């Protein structure tokens, strides 16, 4: 009798220990799990099962949409991404074109059916193309080249306020975001602005940070801190080649766009994915068609994840 009781106690103890260990394992984030109901309610407030995203910006939000779509699909999340693009467009120009109804945008849609473009659109038309869950804004990259982050914010505060008020009136359910863009690569020398070394680059990134955080605080927007992830790659991993090459089909090379070969497009997509969904990008199974080594992919995933963790801690 005592022997049976002893065996029963030992079995119960072993079961408890196994459950505890299993619980710890289940806490590890994975991108292969199906998104939870709570998560989908947050990122899909319109409830149609697809995260509908409208990015209003310029080339700094143009080139990573395919990667973002594919990373999300690998995690079991369907997205429809529409990019409102005009080259080098700054927020005051977005405002002026909206006020005057000017049709200067290219609207690029990426979804389960593929990618397609509509030329010569105005902002009102672009906004009418979906019931948006996510709408993002950003300024042109030169906005803090020759001014502080505080000055850039004050110079553009009225334009941003008007645009956000209009968007919120038209899409009250949508979550609004501001993308914090990145500093140019060391070696950039154009229009009198030079990034001669890592210190100048770091200062430029800090001005972008101040501008973005000021906008988000003033207008209650979520921040997508792409620029912070870039600085982590540069400062922690010693890699400053993210701008190495733009889209291969366009054949452009420069010191400021997110390049495919350099990994900038993949890095940006990882940051956006984590900020929008709350899921870790670490371990995501999507691999780009351009050549990135597994070591590079692991580094970019870690940098994106660290940046978003910093963001979450700062805004907790």
Model segments located where?
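Positively charged n-region of N-terminal signal peptides that target proteins for export
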Residues: 1-7
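C-terminal motif of bacterial Sec signal peptides marking the signal peptidase cleavage site
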Residues: 17-20
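Conserved catalytic region of serine esterases and O-acyltransferases that act on ester linkages
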Residues: 24, 219, 245-316
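N-terminal, intrinsically disordered, polar/charged segments of Gram-positive cell-envelope systems
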Residues: 25-47
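Residues that mark the start of a beta-strand
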Residues: 50-52, 80
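Short hydrophobic segments within beta-strands
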Residues: 54-56, 179
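Conserved SGNH/GDSL esterase-like catalytic core that processes O-acyl groups on lipids
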Residues: 63-157
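Alpha-helical cap/lid subdomain in secreted, periplasmic
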Residues: 121-262, 274
